[in-house]
């Protein structure tokens, strides 16, 4: 099994460490050539946290947006954390256009405010259990379509969800020692292969 990690910007190295802990091979995807070279071998894709506007621009500049979108729509399992969640959203409240736009949800960027407004908590995540959650200027999911399953709620806000082959979290599971949400994603990838 090999998981691709979008490595244009953001917390990609931390995701690679978690996958290594789980004994799963990962490959950093920095450009279209990387993606096309590894695409047939990929069991899944992680879109890490970072700055969603910058990541969206880089995806467009590298001509990666459409090939990744097509792969996701064709069933490639994808896990978007924080900015990665924003990339997957069909609608972003403060923007005119979405990025990948594959997941039926409306999101609000930087809902948890500035860096100083960031926080840590623990909450129940369906299918995983009670897990630690680190929020760093994270988005919230304002609403979801009928096909989207809500996995976690914190302070009456949706912070994790799944739609078919797409898993998202507003928080950063890669910044804790708890690997269960990544294991949940690995299990999704195994079911698809």
Swiss-Prot record:
Pfam family, one: SNO
SUPFAM superfamilies, per the entry: Class I glutamine amidotransferase-like
Residues forming the catalytic site: 82, 172, 174
Molecular functions per Gene Ontology: glutaminase activity; pyridoxal 5'-phosphate synthase (glutamine hydrolysing) activity
Pathway: Cofactor biosynthesis; pyridoxal 5'-phosphate biosynthesis
EC number(s) on file: 4.3.3.6, 3.5.1.2
PROSITE patterns: PDXT_SNO_1 (PS01236), PDXT_SNO_2 (PS51130)
Residues annotated for L-glutamine binding in this entry: 50-52, 109, 136-137
Gene Ontology CC annotation, any one: cytosol
Catalytic reaction annotation: aldehydo-D-ribose 5-phosphate + D-glyceraldehyde 3-phosphate + L-glutamine = pyridoxal 5'-phosphate + L-glutamate + phosphate + 3 H2O + H(+); L-glutamine + H2O = L-glutamate + NH4(+)
Family as reported in the entry's similarity comment: Belongs to the glutaminase PdxT/SNO family.
Function, as annotated: Catalyzes the hydrolysis of glutamine to glutamate and ammonia as part of the biosynthesis of pyridoxal 5'-phosphate. The resulting ammonia molecule is channeled to the active site of PdxS.
Subunit structure of this chain's protein: In the presence of PdxS, forms a dodecamer of heterodimers. Only shows activity in the heterodimer.
Protein name: Pyridoxal 5'-phosphate synthase subunit PdxT
């Amino acid at each position: 099994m090999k998981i691709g990690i979008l490595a244009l910007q953001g917390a990609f190295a931390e995701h690679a460490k978690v996958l290594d802990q789980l004994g799963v091979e990962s490959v950093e995807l920095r450009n279209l050539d990387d993606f096309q070279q590894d695409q047939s071998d990929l069991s899944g894709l992680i879109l890490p946290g970072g700055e969603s506007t910058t990541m969206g621009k880089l995806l467009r500049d590298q001509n990666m947006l459409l090939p990744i979108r097509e792969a996701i729509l064709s069933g490639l399992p994808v896990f978007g954390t924080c900015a990665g969640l924003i990339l997957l959203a069909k609608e972003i409240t403060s923007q005119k256009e979405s990025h990948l736009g594959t997941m039926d949800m409306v999101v609000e960027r930087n809902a948890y405010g500035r860096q100083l407004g960031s926080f840590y908590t623990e909450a129940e995540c369906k299918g995983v259990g009670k897990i630690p959650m680190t929020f760093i200027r994270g988005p919230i999911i304002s609403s979801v379509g009928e096909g989207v399953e809500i996995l976690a709620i914190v302070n009456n806000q949706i912070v994790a969800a799944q739609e078919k082959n797409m898993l998202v979290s507003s928080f950063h599971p890669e910044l804790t020692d708890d690997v269960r949400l990544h294991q949940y994603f690995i299990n999704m990838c195994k079911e698809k292969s």
